[in-house]
Curated annotation (Swiss-Prot):
One term under GO cellular component: cytoplasm
HAMAP family: HisZ
Similarity annotation: Belongs to the class-II aminoacyl-tRNA synthetase family. HisZ subfamily.
Matches recorded under SUPFAM superfamilies: Class II aaRS and biotin synthetases
Cellular compartment(s): Cytoplasm
GO molecular function, one term: transferase activity
Stored InterPro entries: aa-tRNA-synth_II, aa-tRNA-synth_II/BPL/LPL, HisRS-like_core, HisRS/HisZ, HisZ
Pathway involvement of the protein, from the record: Amino-acid biosynthesis; L-histidine biosynthesis; L-histidine from 5-phospho-alpha-D-ribose 1-diphosphate: step 1/9
Pfam families in UniProt: tRNA-synt_His
Protein name: ATP phosphoribosyltransferase regulatory subunit
Major localization class: cytoplasm
Keywords: Amino-acid biosynthesis, Cytoplasm, Histidine biosynthesis
Function (record text): Required for the first step of histidine biosynthesis. May allow the feedback regulation of ATP phosphoribosyltransferase activity by histidine.
Length: 420
């Protein structure tokens, strides 16, 4: 029964020291940026009822959920998604809209072994609820771009797609559900040969404008020229409106000076079925990993209450941390500046000294050792150059200068008061 006691479950890992600090800093900077832009914070439980994710369209594969039973035999899951629980909150709590919310938390999905993906990840994100015009999408994209800039993430791009255009094509060509799943993989992977064979095998008329658009879909990525090409082949008002929406979002963000951070990919199709319109994916060039995902989901909240339009974007914190580690100098956690060694009957005074010294922005810690030499050894091992000894009625300050020496009177000292 102890076979696995020294191992982590598949798809999970431990985060230590510097990496933990960096994850926390990324989360806090994202949170601060979103709060400054008027978003309000929401927290949902790490565990949810299975039914929350089991509505008709089944947006999350059942096999990807971690499931267990509560004390009453009901099926519980570790949340595999952040947006659906937020939709539950908004739908059941009857929140006033429009509403801008932000969140951060862990998400759990059981990926295939050896797929190179973690089963537990950290997501921070935003949702704009109750607005059906392009201002909602624009607000989300601007917020994420600014947050990534503040994190000093280099060479990233956010792709804008339109799942509604794809759904219009599928509907007009009467492609059945099972066939659509296969078609989706061909378009997402930009498998031109397989897509061409699919059109041939289905005996679709290649002279038909909609079929032409379908065949071109994986190639429609780039800038506004892509929109012009798609508009020429759009055979219904619904298709034209879907394309126009992407154009409006792109132009608005470009006018703000963020054009270098965005591109268009009309062949992008999100794997989550609850998206109904414009969708987004963000990447860092050097890594190729997805760092941002999201889109419009106007029908999701209706599963829990009133039907409300909504847009959301999630930032993959783990991937951001990975990018920062690769593009910057090795991250160094802030080391202890001063260590206080004290006699046990001087604990109160030592803690008072620690509080005073840290007000100057220093990192100060109390020694855990009863012997001064042990404190010195620990300080050297951890590159701490100042040790203050609090004993009886006095303070002695030691500094490392090839050896531990007493700080002489008249030299700059970290000690700002005498023990009473």
């Amino acid at each position: 029964m102890t076979k696995w006691k020294r191992a982590n479950p598949n798809g999970t890992r431990d985060y230590l020291f510097e990496e933990c600090t960096l994850i926390e800093e990324v989360e806090q900077k994202l949170r601060r940026t979103f709060l400054e832009r008027g978003y309000e914070e929401i927290r949902t439980p790490t565990i949810e009822f299975y039914d929350v994710f089991a509505f008709q369209s089944r947006p999350i594969d059942e096999e990807k959920m971690y499931k267990f039973f509560d004390e009453k035999g009901r099926i519980i899951v570790l949340r595999p998604d952040m947006t659906i629980p937020l939709a539950r909150v908004v739908g059941t709590q009857r929140c006033d809209t429009p509403l801008k919310v932000t969140y951060s938390g862990n998400v759990f999905r059981a990926n295939e072994s050896l797929a190179g993906k973690y089963n537990e990840i950290v997501q921070s994100g935003i949702e704009v609820i109750g607005i059906d015009n392009v201002r909602a999408e624009i607000e989300c994209v601007i917020s994420v771009i600014q947050s990534l800039q503040k994190l000093k993430v280099q060479s990233f791009t956010i792709e804008i797609g339109q799942v509604q255009l794809y759904k219009c094509i599928v509907k007009k060509l009467s492609i059945h559900e099972e066939e659509e799943k296969v078609l989706r993989t061909y378009i997402e992977s930009k498998n031109y040969a397989a897509l061409s064979n699919f059109i041939r095998d289905k005996k679709l008329d290649r002279c038909d404008e909609t079929v032409k658009l379908l065949e071109k879909l994986p190639r429609l990525f780039g800038n506004l020229e892509v929109i012009e090409e798609a508009e020429k082949l759009a055979s219904s008002n619904e298709m034209k409106m879907a394309i126009t929406r992407v154009k409006e979002i792109y132009e608005a963000i470009e006018k703000l000076g963020y054009g270098s951070y965005i591109s268009i990919d009309l062949g992008m199709i999100q794997h989550l079925d609850y998206y109904t319109g414009v969708i987004f994916k963000g990447y860092i060039y050097e890594i190729g990993e997805e760092i941002v995902s999201g889109g419009r989901y106007d029908e999701l909240i209706g599963n829990f209450g009133e039907m409300l339009p909504a847009v959301g974007l999630a930032v993959q914190v783990n991937q951001i941390v990975k990018a920062l580690q690769e593009q910057q100098e090795p991250y160094e956690r802030k080391r202890i500046d001063i260590m206080i060694h004290y006699e046990l009957n001087r604990l109160a005074e030592a803690e008072r000294l620690r509080n005073l010294l840290q007000k100057d922005g220093k990192k100060v810690a109390l020694s855990l050792f009863s012997n001064l030499n042990d404190t010195f050894q620990f300080a050297r091992k951890n590159q701490i150059v100042t040790v203050v000894e609090a004993k009886s009625e006095s303070l002695v300050e030691y500094v490392w200068k090839e050896k531990w020496v007493v700080q002489k009177e008249g030299e700059t000292s970290c000690v700002t008061f005498k023990l009473r």
